[in-house]
Regions:
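ABC ATPase nucleotide-binding domains
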Residues: 223-252
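Conserved ABC ATPase "signature" region
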Residues: 101-119
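The feature captures the beta-strand-to-loop junction immediately N-terminal to the Walker
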Residues: 35-37
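Conserved ABC ATPase signature
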Residues: 123-127, 131
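H-loop (His-switch) and adjacent beta-strand-loop-beta switch element
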Residues: 197-210
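Helix-to-loop junction immediately C-terminal to a conserved catalytic motif
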Residues: 50
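Catalytic Walker B motif of ABC-type/P-loop ATPase nucleotide-binding domains
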Residues: 148-152
Length: 252
């Protein structure tokens, strides 16, 4: 099988390389979680893959296009939700042409898939952060790109919407054979949906491989600087990770 996203000897960063050269071969249907502490370079990696930030060395090869869901989006105009999502169809619409019925259908289908069809006519700027995140995911869906990148897709979402988004990520892989890469601080999210994980470590090092092998207690302790426990709860197929720290309180 031919990879749809390949990082070869990739060095990335704003001025100097954040990590040792990175090599990844992401296959159709694989879900990659990018884990690491704040400031480790997770978002910078996605910016490099999409070309927003030039690579310092090495190369990125993406087959079938790349759709990106950024952490935040501030449109310059007072756009409605359906207009923001329609932006994702730009490469399917001829220059200066009007959107076709198929484009509009794709927009409404994507909104319905995320349970936000009722927001289609709402001004994007009036939505909560979590609602805006769902709209941006819908925008990526309608682009029909083979590779979907999501930057902290669950960061602004409540628990119910986190489940919706993680289920969607799983469906993109298993039902549509898309290649998905998402950044997250939560190792449990990686264990729930990711087939593979890239763990960004201190000292310019990284680990990559099947998620159950990478998301181990010792690796997470080294990456985050806190003790953690990986637990297998009865009745649930995926382990969960909980930090083992306590908060000091004044003596009474």
């Amino acid at each position: 099988m031919t990879p749809t996203l390949t990082l070869s000897q990739l060095e990335y960063g704003h001025q100097s390389a954040l990590f040792a050269p990175l090599n990844l071969h992401c296959q159709p249907g694989e879900i990659w979680a990018v884990l690491g502490a704040n400031g480790r370079g997770k978002s910078t990696l996605l910016d490099t893959i999409t070309g927003v930030l030039p690579a310092l060395a090495g190369s990125v090869k993406a087959s079938g296009g790349v759709g990106i869901v950024p952490q935040s989006f501030r449109p310059a105009f007072g756009w409605r939700v359906k207009e923001v999502v329609l932006m994702g169809r730009a490469r399917h619409i001829a220059l200066f042409a009007q959107p076709q019925k198929e484009d509009e259908r794709q927009v409404l289908d994507a909104l319905a898939q995320l349970n936000i069809a009722d927001l289609a006519e709402t001004l994007f700027s009036t939505l909560s952060g979590g609602q805006q995140q769902l709209v941006m995911i819908a925008r990526a869906l309608v682009g029909a790109s083979q590779n979907i990148l999501l930057d902290e897709p669950c960061s602004a979402l409540d628990l119910g919407n986190q489940q919706t988004v993680l289920q969607l990520i799983s469906d993109l892989s298993h039902n549509q054979s898309r290649t998905v890469m998402f950044t997250t601080h939560d190792p449990t999210h990686a264990l729930q949906v990711a087939s593979h994980t890239l763990l960004l470590m201190p000292g310019n090092q990284w680990l990559a491989g099947p998620t159950p092998e990478v998301v181990q207690e010792e690796n997470l302790r080294h990456a985050y600087g806190v003790q953690v426990r990986r637990l297998q709860l009865e009745g649930y197929p995926s382990p969960v990770v909980t930090p083992l720290f306590s908060i000091r309180r004044p003596a009474t």
